[in-house]
A protein has these predicted regions:
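Hydrophobic alpha-helical transmembrane segments of multi-pass inner-membrane transport and secretion
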Residues: 18-48, 54-91, 111-125, 205, ...
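Short helix-loop junctions at transmembrane helix boundaries
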Residues: 40-54, 123-155, 212-230, 605-666
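Hydrophobic transmembrane helix bundles of membrane-integrated enzymes that assemble
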Residues: 200-221, 228-253, 285-318, 322-328, ...
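Hydrophobic alpha-helical segments
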Residues: 113-257
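Basic-flanked hydrophobic alpha-helices used for secretion and membrane insertion
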Residues: 315-556
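N-terminal Sec/SRP start-transfer signal
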Residues: 1-32, 196-201, 210, 245-294, ...
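Short cytosolic juxtamembrane segments of multi-pass membrane proteins
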Residues: 3-5, 180-194, 571-572, 662-666
Length: 666
C-alpha cells in the first residue's frame, strides 16, 4: 500500500472514532492555545519601557514552564485512554491481514493529522485571543501596554517543538503496545477486566503515614519563610499518599464492606461493590489524578483571587506609611545591611527632610522615628539564645529598644525598674512568661496592656516571627551583647512620614529624600507607597492572571480524565449489566446500581480534594502572610466561595458525563 492510502485510511479512522478522538483533540487544542499565549506574553511583546514589566515577565515565564510540563504529562496520560479503547480495532486490522509495520504507518499519519490540527487551530485561536487576554492582563495590573502583533516566531517555534515531542512520545508508546502484543490479545484487550486485587496492607499503611506527615506539616505553626519550604514538602507527601490510599486504601475499604454480610448481600450494594472492587486498580490512578487536579484548582484559584481582591490591603500592609526610610545594621543575609548608623547621620537626614518640606510648604500628618537594635536569635519559650542554625527561617527577629524610644513612638509613659523589660510577641495578646532570658541575663517581664503593639512589631514584613523587647534606658546595648556576645555595630532606624498632599507630591518628596540620603552618604533606602503601588499591582495582577490560566488548565485536565473514565467504564460495564438483566434484575434495579457506583466513584475525589484544601489552609495562610496579605477571614471566605463554585462545576460535569455513561451501558 502506498502512503496516500495510509493517509486516507488514517483520516477515515479518526472520523469513525470521533467519540474518543474529538475530546482528545479539543484538549490538545486547549493546551496549545494556553501555552502559545503564555509563551507569547513571556516574550515581552508590548511591555517595552513599562514600569513593572520585569515582574510580569517573570510570572509569565514561570507560567510557561508550568503549562508546558502539565501539557506533556496530561496529553500522554490522555493518550493511554485512547490506546486502550482502540486495542480491539488494531487487533482486527492484524487479523484481516495488516502487518505491524502497516499499523505503524497508519498510526504515524493519525498522529501527524492530530498534531497539525492541534497546532493549526490552537495557534490561530491563540493569535485571536492574545489581544483580549493582553487587555485583561493590563486591566489586572493597572498598567498601560502597547498591543502588538501577537504572532511571535519564537513562541510558535517553542509550541511546535513541545507538542511535536509530545506527539512523538505518544506515537512511540502506541507503537510499543502494538509490537509487544499478539492480535488476539489486542482484539480482547479493550474488554479485559481486572482480576480482584489483593489487599496491599503495606501500601495502605504507607499512604496513611505519608498523608499524616503531610497534614502535620500543614497544620503545625511555623514562620512564613519556613512555611514556603514545608508547603512543597507537604504537597509531595500528600500527592504520594493520595495515590497510595486510592490504590490500596480504597481496596481495603471495599473488602471490609464485602466482609459485612448484612451490607454486602443487598442487590444494590452487591453489584456495585463487586464491580468497583474488580476494577479499582485501574480506577485508582484516574481518581487520584482527578483528586490532585481538583485540589490544585481550589488552591490556585482561591489564593490568586484572594490576593487580587485584597490588593489595596496588601499595599497598605506592606507600605503602612506614604514614605519610609529604613537602615538595618548587623543582620546580614536576610535583610538589607548597611554601614553602622549614627545619631549624627540620622539628625542630618531629618534636618534635610524638614528643610525640603518647608521649601515646598508641605505639612506632616504623621511622623514616626524608631531606633533600636535588631538581631536573629533562637527562641525557646522564654529563652533567647544566639542562633545556631544556618536556616534563617527557623529564627526569630528580635528588636531591642529603650523605654524612652518606646514612649516616644507610642505616646505612652512606661517606667521600668532595674531588671525589668516589656516583651511583645507576634500574634499574642500578652507575653506568656513572667521572665525572659536574654543570653546570660534574666529580666522580669512587666505586665503592660497596650493597644500600641503594631507600632513596635514589624508586622509589615510578615516573614519572620517577631519579638520586641523594651529595656531601661542605656541597657538595650547590654541586652543585645548578652545574646550575641558582642556589642551592636550601630542603630537600626525606621522613619515613617505621612504628608498632607497628593500622590504626585509624595513621590516628589520621596525622590528628594533619596537625593538627601545620597548627599549625606547615608546607606539606607526609601520606599514611597505610590511609587511601589505599580509593582504590587504588577505582581498580584499577573499572579491572578496566571492563577486563572493554570486553574482553567487543571480543570480541563480533570474534566477530560473524568470523561474518559466514564466512557471507558461504560464500555466495560455494558456487558456486565446485560448479564444482570438476563439473570432477572429489573431496569430500575440496574439503574440504581449504576447510579450508586457512578456517584460514589465520581464524588470521592471531590470530597478528598476539599479535605486536602481545608488542611492546607493554615499553611497557605502563612504563605499569604509572607506576600503581605494578613486578612485570614477574607482568605477563608475566598476559599469557601471557590469550593462552592467548583462543586457546582463538578456537578455539571457529572450530569453531562453520566449521560454518556448511561447511554453506553443501556
Amino acid at each position: 500500500m502506498n502512503n496516500l492510502l495510509y493517509a486516507r485510511l488514517a483520516k477515515t479512522n479518526l472520523s469513525k472514532n470521533r467519540q474518543n478522538i474529538l475530546p482528545y483533540l479539543l484538549s490538545c487544542i486547549g493546551t496549545v492555545v494556553m501555552f502559545f499565549i503564555m509563551d507569547t506574553l513571556a516574550q515581552g511583546s508590548g511591555f517595552d519601557s513599562m514600569i513593572g514589566k520585569d515582574t510580569i515577565l517573570t510570572v509569565m515565564g514561570m507560567g510557561t514552564y508550568i503549562i508546558g510540563l502539565f501539557a506533556v504529562i496530561f496529553l500522554i496520560y490522555s493518550n493511554s485512554f485512547l490506546a486502550k479503547r482502540r486495542k480491539k480495532e488494531f487487533g482486527l486490522f492484524q487479523i484481516l491481514g495488516m502487518e505491524k509495520k502497516h499499523l505503524a504507518k497508519l498510526l504515524f499519519f493519525e498522529s501527524l493529522y492530530l498534531w497539525a490540527a492541534s497546532l493549526g487551530i490552537g495557534i490561530l485561536l491563540g493569535v485571536l485571543l492574545y489581544r483580549l487576554l493582553f487587555l485583561v492582563l493590563m486591566k489586572l495590573t493597572g498598567l498601560n501596554g502597547t498591543i502588538g502583533f501577537a504572532f511571535s516566531a519564537k513562541a510558535v517555534g517553542s509550541t511546535m517543538l513541545l507538542f511535536g515531542l509530545t506527539f512523538v512520545i505518544n506515537f512511540l508508546l502506541s507503537l510499543r503496545q502494538i509490537h509487544v502484543s499478539q492480535p488476539v490479545e489486542l482484539l480482547h484487550g479493550g474488554a479485559q477486566g481486572e482480576r480482584e486485587p489483593k489487599t496491599k496492607l503495606l501500601t495502605a499503611v504507607l499512604g496513611f503515614m505519608l498523608l499524616g506527615v503531610g497534614y502535620y506539616l500543614a497544620l503545625t505553626r511555623q514562620s512564613s519563610m519556613d512555611a514556603l519550604d514545608k508547603f512543597f514538602n507537604a504537597i509531595a507527601l500528600v500527592m504520594v499518599g493520595t495515590y497510595c490510599l486510592f490504590s490500596a486504601g480504597s481496596i481495603a475499604f471495599l473488602k471490609i464492606l464485602k466482609k459485612n454480610k448484612n451490607y454486602y448481600y443487598q442487590t444494590r450494594h452487591f453489584t456495585s461493590i463487586s464491580g468497583m472492587l474488580y476494577r479499582m486498580k485501574q480506577n485508582a490512578v484516574g481518581l487520584a489524578n482527578i483528586c490532585i487536579l481538583s485540589t490544585g484548582v481550589l488552591l490556585v484559584i482561591s489564593i490568586s483571587t484572594c490576593l487580587w481582591t485584597g490588593i489595596e490591603e496588601v499595599t497598605y500592609t506592606r507600605f503602612p506609611h506614604q514614605i519610609s526610610i529604613e537602615a538595618n545594621t548587623g543582620v546580614s543575609g536576610i535583610m538589607k545591611t548597611v554601614e553602622p548608623v549614627s545619631q549624627k547621620m540620622i539628625e542630618e537626614v531629618k534636618t534635610g527632610i524638614d528643610q525640603h518640606l518647608e521649601e515646598k510648604q508641605l505639612r506632616k500628618k504623621y511622623e514616626s522615628d524608631q531606633r533600636y537594635y535588631v538581631m536573629l536569635a533562637d527562641v525557646d519559650r522564654n529563652k533567647v539564645e544566639k542562633t545556631q542554625s544556618d536556616d534563617a527561617a527557623a529564627s526569630t527577629l528580635i528588636k531591642i529598644m529603650e523605654e524612652s524610644e518606646y514612649n516616644q513612638v507610642t505616646g505612652e509613659q512606661v517606667e521600668l525598674e532595674p531588671g525589668q523589660a516589656l516583651v511583645f510577641q507576634e500574634k499574642q495578646k500578652n507575653y506568656g512568661y513572667d521572665t525572659i532570658e536574654l543570653g546570660n541575663q534574666t529580666y522580669e517581664v512587666k505586665k503592660w496592656n497596650t493597644d500600641k503593639k503594631s507600632y513596635v512589631l514589624d508586622e509589615k514584613t510578615q516573614v519572620y516571627e517577631t519579638m520586641t523587647v523594651v529595656t531601661r534606658n542605656h541597657e538595650a546595648k547590654e541586652a543585645y551583647a548578652a545574646v550575641q556576645g558582642k556589642e551592636p555595630e550601630g542603630y537600626s532606624w525606621e522613619y515613617a512620614l505621612d504628608l498632607i498632599g497628593d500622590a504626585g507630591e509624595q513621590i516628589t518628596v520621596g525622590n528628594e529624600i533619596e537625593t538627601i540620603l545620597t548627599e549625606s552618604s547615608f546607606n539606607g533606602w526609601v520606599e514611597v507607597r505610590e511609587k511601589e503601588r505599580n509593582t504590587v499591582y504588577s505582581l498580584y495582577g499577573s499572579l491572578l492572571f496566571l492563577g486563572v490560566f493554570v486553574g482553567a488548565l487543571f480543570l480541563m485536565g480533570a474534566v477530560m480524565i473524568i470523561y474518559y473514565k466514564q466512557v471507558s467504564e461504560g464500555f466495560d460495564d455494558r456487558k456486565r449489566f446485560q448479564i444482570m438483566q438476563k439473570v432477572g434484575m429489573s431496569r430500575k434495579e440496574i439503574r440504581q446500581t449504576i447510579q450508586s457506583q457512578v456517584v460514589t466513584v465520581f464524588f470521592l475525589p471531590l470530597a478528598v480534594a476539599v479535605v486536602h484544601t481545608m488542611v492546607a489552609f493554615p499553611l497557605t495562610r502563612r504563605i499569604m502572610a509572607m506576600l503581605n496579605f494578613p486578612d485570614s477571614n477574607l482568605f477563608l471566605v475566598a476559599t469557601a466561595i471557590t469550593i462552592a463554585a467548583f462543586a457546582v462545576v463538578y456537578l455539571i460535569v457529572y450530569v453531562l458525563t453520566a449521560r454518556a455513561y448511561y447511554k453506553i451501558v443501556e
